[in-house]
Amino acid sequence: MVRMNVLADALKCINNAEKRGKRQVLLRPCSKVIIKFLTVMMKHGYIGEFEIVDDHRSGKIVVNLTGRLNKCGVISPRFDVPINDIEKWTNNLLPSRQFGYVVLTTSGGIMDHEEARRKHLGGKILGFFF
């Protein structure tokens, strides 16, 4: 079976494993977008370290969970978000201003909404986590 949205599958696996109280989760297939998204999550401490396993096919990622993640999801379709509309999207997606991040793909790479605002970049919205 062909997977339509690998990022959505990966985030749903992380969500389900976190709800079940697992310490680790195995994601496959591996992609650059998933790795960058996980890097943003790890930078903010929502997940632990992750390891990329090369199985000579599409690859696997083993993610260590910390129990801090409440929810993560993907936004499909990937809407264009200018800099002025980032605030509107964060209000819609996140429960509060104090925590949670919206992940954007910009011309400067994949980053959270705060970094995009600092660098004055708009882009396409990938997903969120809190």
Curated annotation (Swiss-Prot):
Domain of life, source organism: Eukaryota
Molecular function GO terms recorded: structural constituent of ribosome
InterPro entries: Ribosomal_uS8, Ribosomal_uS8_CS, Ribosomal_uS8_sf
Keywords: Ribonucleoprotein, Ribosomal protein
Biological process (GO), any one: cytoplasmic translation
Any Pfam family the entry gives: Ribosomal_S8
Gene Ontology CC entries for this record: cytosolic ribosome; cytosolic small ribosomal subunit
Keyword Ribosomal protein: yes
The keyword S-adenosyl-L-methionine is assigned to this record: no
Family: Belongs to the universal ribosomal protein uS8 family.
Protein name: Small ribosomal subunit protein uS8A
UniProt lineage: Eukaryota, Metazoa, Ecdysozoa, Arthropoda, Hexapoda
Protein encoded by which gene: RpS15Aa
